[in-house]
């Protein structure tokens, strides 16, 4: 993570701030892909998390991901947040589809 602009932003409640991974621009065979054929990037790295949302009994439910986790995002959704000319996306914890495990 080159910049630290996301440190100026703290998500509230069950929100998660992510930085999308870069799209593949070259195939394994060395062929350059045009932008239209690259597809939408659904992988991201978590850069900040909120404190959690309220459960049914009023207790705070912690967010299910932590900073540094690699996650799978839905194709649509999220709120674009621009910090120091860099694009980040804000999702609810429940909207994140999964977490990659090493």
Swiss-Prot record:
Induction of synthesis: By stress.
Gene3D superfamilies: GroES chaperonin
Keywords, ordered alphabetically: Acetylation, Chaperone, Mitochondrion, Phosphoprotein, Stress response
Positions bearing N6-acetyllysine: 8, 40, 56, 66, 70, 80, 86, 99
GO cellular component term of the entry, any: mitochondrial matrix
GO terms classed as biological process: chaperone cofactor-dependent protein refolding
Modified residues (Phosphothreonine): 79
Keyword Chaperone among record annotations: yes
Family annotation (SUPFAM superfamilies): GroES-like
Modified residues (N6-succinyllysine): 28, 40, 54, 56, 66, 70, 80, 86
InterPro entries given in the database record: Chaperonin_GroES, Chaperonin_GroES_sf, Chaprnonin_Cpn10_CS, GroES-like_sf
Residues annotated with N6-malonyllysine modification: 40, 54, 56
Residues recorded as bearing N-acetylalanine in the entry: 2
GO molecular function annotation: ATP binding; metal ion binding; protein folding chaperone; protein-folding chaperone binding; unfolded protein binding
Subcellular location: Mitochondrion matrix
Protein's UniProt keywords contain NADP: no
Pfam families cross-referenced by the UniProt entry: Cpn10
PANTHER family the UniProt entry points to: 10 KDA HEAT SHOCK PROTEIN (PTHR10772), 10 KDA HEAT SHOCK PROTEIN, MITOCHONDRIAL (PTHR10772:SF0)
Entry's family note: Belongs to the GroES chaperonin family.
Quaternary assembly: Homoheptamer arranged in a ring structure. 2 heptameric Hsp10 rings interact with a Hsp60 tetradecamer in the structure of a back-to-back double heptameric ring to form the symmetrical football complex.
Role this protein plays: Co-chaperonin implicated in mitochondrial protein import and macromolecular assembly. Together with Hsp60, facilitates the correct folding of imported proteins. May also prevent misfolding and promote the refolding and proper assembly of unfolded polypeptides generated under stress conditions in the mitochondrial matrix. The functional units of these chaperonins consist of heptameric rings of the large subunit Hsp60, which function as a back-to-back double ring.
Name of the protein described by the UniProt record: 10 kDa heat shock protein, mitochondrial
Annotated organism of origin: Rattus norvegicus (Rat)
